[in-house]
């Protein structure tokens, strides 16, 4: 890496092809990317890949995004901990809360975001328009759930400074109103996902036509007993929904189920962590908003009261290689599922391409996957001490 003025040159191995590349970066973007011919030193080069993009971060490194007491210092710790784990872009995720609390809390998050323009690129509102059914609600509070509300949409967009980038809803709770809500949200600049839902294939298709792009953490928030042929998993697979996210921690979706779903979905899969405060932290008791979560020594995050899963402790960089381990498919395909594809949902040009923002990871694969450095908009923001 040779910095010069506001420019630098990096030599690294392309994560897809393994070929040695010379990459020139100026003013935070890739200026020139070219193959290095006949390089005898390329095996010593680090691998280079676009930074990871996580659409669902509830917390990280001991910090809860949903905490009323979230400070600017804590928010910066969370952002930098995510840098350390390969994440150059993420959505701070707000779970279901009282309707009248969204405006004030999003104003606060927007202020934090403006003061610390790091890797948080906006907000994901997971709720309050979710299914109250026992199998689908997860740890979200039923009493705070409601039908889609267009006036609420205007309020949260204004309060967030337009930074609500993803909203997860269950369209079956009011089909007609949900379709109207999806159209309006998309028009205002937010992507829409379906999740915590029992939507049928027909309703999913209607939502797709209206603009829905994603199913949020498929396989999670699902009743343990479903009809043999008419169930959410088959309906999502058979639908035209462009993407479905999966949590590759082996706890939310066991290995065999993960293999089956990813084979069926193919390139429609994206990876998310659904990380909560206990991620990149010690076992113990944490909070996800109002919910008390116990993280056990194996890293499983469980709601203390109900015993249900309450987010994950997955680190994004590890998620790529856990997905590879569970499926046996090439790791670089999972890297795309955790970087380029989620960026597409948000309309962000991402990837190793001239003119794109130079936000990337440098890492080794042997003897184990290991993140060396992370760059954000051409600036080194993390360097391993090892």
Predicted segments, located by residue:
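Charged helix-capping and loop-helix junction motifs
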Residues: 73, 105-108, 150, 228-233
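Divalent metal-binding pocket/active-site signature
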Residues: 125-127, 132-231
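Divalent metal-coordination and catalytic microenvironments
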Residues: 28, 56, 82, 125, ...
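N-terminal metal-binding scaffold of metallo-dependent hydrolase/deaminase domains
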Residues: 1-37, 379-380, 384
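C-terminal cap of metal-dependent C-N hydrolases
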Residues: 351-386
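Active-site-adjacent C-terminal substructures of enzyme catalytic domains
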Residues: 203-338, 344-348, 363-369
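Divalent metal-dependent hydrolysis catalytic cores, especially in the metallo-beta-lactamase
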Residues: 58-64, 76-105, 118-131, 160-172, ...
